[in-house]
Amino acid sequence: MNKSESRYFNTAVRFNKALLSLLEKKPFEYITISEICEKAEVNRSTFYLHYENTSDLLKETTTYVLDNFTSYFSVDAESIIAQFAN
């Protein structure tokens, strides 16, 4: 991953974390792009470079959460399989 890709990825993660934090406080329907940008400490114009709207961010954030969640199982599954193989 080059420097530009890394920066893009890090910004996306900041948006994901900002949305998750805001979702702890209120329903998705009431979260604004301005609030997300403020929480992520990123300009609004940067938001629109990444997403068309808040629904796009929600889709990506859902994938981000699920990928992190399932990563715990893949490690455990491999160790379980290794135990049965012995």
Predicted feature residues:
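Hydrophobic pocket-lining residues that define ligand/cofactor binding sites across diverse proteins
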Residues: 23
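Residues within the helices of the helix-turn-helix
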Residues: 34
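An amphipathic alpha-helix adjacent to DNA-recognition modules
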Residues: 9-20, 29-30, 41, 50-74, ...
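N-terminal intrinsically disordered/low-complexity leader segments
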Residues: 1-8
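The alpha-helix within a helix-turn-helix
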Residues: 37
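Short functional hotspots where side chains directly engage DNA or cofactors
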Residues: 44
